[in-house]
Amino acid sequence: MDSFPEIEIAEYKVFDESNNNDDNVLNISYGVDENYLDGVGVSIASVVLNNNIPLAFHIICDSYSPCFVKYIERLAVQHHIKISLYLIKVESLEVLPQTKVWSRAMYFRLFAFDYLSKKVNTLLYLDADVVCKGSLQDLLQLDLTEKIAAVVKDVDSIQNKVNERLSAFNLQGGYFNSGVVFVNLKLWKENALTKKAFLLLAGKEADSFKYPDQDVLNILLQDKVIFLPRPYNTIYTIKSELKDKSHKKYSNIINDNTILIHYTGATKPWHAWANYPSVIYYKNARLNSPWKDFPAKDARTIVEFKKRYKHLLVQGHYFKGLLAGSAYLYRKLFHK
């Protein structure tokens, strides 16, 4: 195959409650499956609460409920913004690799970069587990005329091992995290990068991609990016709370300068067992969104069941932790 799989838009909805001039709008996109939709809604709310600039949001997903559509419409009305919802058919993506942790929804950003290049010149892509706590206004003035994207380098634990996995590409020191990417869509399209990404994903090197979409973006954009400072992608894993009995060390990472918090790892701020001060920014945004009365999410995957019982025990919920541990062991033994 020599081109990116054709992805059909099955349904398109737009809720426009803004008075935006398209020339000065910060366009922001998300690409998710149904398990991350609520996270997207709260992420959008967090952006709006911290920014008084023209905004337009694009959500690309393969499934959604009528309830989600209703809440997205409420969000647009509540904050006077424009939200476009793209329901896509993804059968053609079955040829691409996926992992136990990441579904093929990780490729939706590649579709977003390609499809939205027909509509807008620049696009900020955010993962659904990114929460905003500062101003994004400077991105509107960022000069991307000679670079394809603006990104933030990944953390040292990932950075220092990248050449072991991708030795042929010499990415160490410049490897970036793809959870926050500000893209020059004109140059993306001119360089046919979606097509090139697919060729890499379907090629012989694919087995070495631990983070398929992120690895491919790093390979294609090597020496073609501007590096933004850490506040634009402040990576924090809630797993670190298991070792921090004070639950205060997060403030060494998430601080007054932080603009975007990226909650990486299996435990997300919307999980029922993520009861820590470090997720207050997510909770504040949720309380100012249509999802304010939604219950926190329970464990769904075997990995989440494992994380749940560990966090409950650390929090001193011993009985609940033992029950959760039993539920994890049961699934581990009988639901392989």
Swiss-Prot record:
Enzyme class: transferase
Biochemical pathway: Bacterial outer membrane biogenesis; LPS core biosynthesis
Enzyme Commission no: 2.4.1.58
Gene3D superfamilies on file: Spore Coat Polysaccharide Biosynthesis Protein SpsA, Chain A
Gene null: resulting phenotype: The mutant synthesizes truncated outer core region, does not express the O antigen and cannot invade epithelial cells. LPS contains one glucose and two galactose units.
Record-given protein name: Lipopolysaccharide 1,2-glucosyltransferase
Motif segment (DXD 2): 213-215
Pfam families: Glyco_transf_8, Glyco_transf_8C
Tree of life domain: Bacteria
Residues given in the record as Mg(2+) binding sites: D127, D129, H262
Gene that encodes it: waaJ
Keywords: Cell inner membrane, Cell membrane, Glycosyltransferase, Lipopolysaccharide biosynthesis, Magnesium, Membrane, Metal-binding, Transferase
Keyword Amino-acid biosynthesis listed: no
Motif (DXD 1): 127-129
Membership in a protein family: Belongs to the glycosyltransferase 8 family.
Major place of residence: membrane
